[in-house]
Design a protein with these regions (language model features):
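N-terminal active-site segment of His-dependent metallophosphoesterases
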Residues: 1-58
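Active-site-proximal beta-strand elements of phosphoester/diester hydrolases
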Residues: 4-17, 108-120, 152-156
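Active-site neighborhood of phospho(di)ester-bond hydrolases with catalytic His/Asp-centered motifs
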Residues: 9-11, 42-48, 71-77, 152-156, ...
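Catalytic metal-binding/acid-base residues of hydrolase active sites
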Residues: 14, 49-50, 78-79, 117, ...
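Extended active-site neighborhood of metal-dependent phosphoesterases/phosphodiesterases
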Residues: 54-150, 166-171
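Sequence/structural signature of outer-membrane beta-barrel proteins
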Residues: 160-162
């Protein structure tokens, strides 16, 4: 493992239509495709893969084929199945990308990707939270992680925010 490994972590690709997929292709992804400094670690995109139109998943995921590394994902609030209940809120996401939360080892790092979107809350709203099942999984995952690994926690909605500390949202 490298002492100076570099990982690409990006958020909010958030394409709303095929034109925006094209802008992402000719912009950020073309720029990233010319870099190789993160190839030993890969890329992690931390939510809002698309901007509510889940039919754009294949087009947006195809962009990551331009990278010189593997790409992994976690969901954000714009990746929701808005017509689903809480249990099925990320069914389409899971069909396209796999589990909504997961972990993996790369070099000196153990990277934990969390699903931090609670939906629905009060009708059609969302909140930032981690449910009890995921918290139990997280504890077990950390317990299994060798002590010499650097642990990186990634989530779409921040796990703690000073700006929302007095409210019930994003807690």
């Amino acid at each position: 493992a490298l002492d100076n490994q570099r990982c690409l972590i990006g958020g909010d690709i958030q394409t709303y239509d095929k034109d925006e997929v094209g802008y992402a292709r000719t912009g950020a992804f073309t720029d990233l495709s010319q870099r190789d400094d993160f190839t030993n670690c890969g890329a992690l995109f931390i939510g809002d893969v698309v901007g509510d139109d889940l039919s754009l998943y294949p087009d947006t995921r195809e962009l990551t084929g331009m990278l010189n590394s593997p790409a992994r994902f976690l969901p954000g609030n714009h990746d929701l199945d808005f017509d689903a209940d809480a249990e099925h809120k990320f069914d389409t996401y899971r069909q396209e990308f796999g589990p909504a939360y997961h972990s993996y080892d790369v070099g000196n790092a153990h990277i934990i990707s969390l699903e931090s979107v609670e939906y629905p809350v009060d009708g059609e709203q969302y909140n930032g939270a981690i449910d009890d099942d995921q918290m139990a999984w997280l504890r077990a995952d950390i317990e299994r992680t060798p002590e010499d690994k650097v642990i990186v926690l990634a989530s779409h909605i921040p796990l703690f925010s000073f700006s929302d500390s007095g409210s019930g949202r994003h807690q």
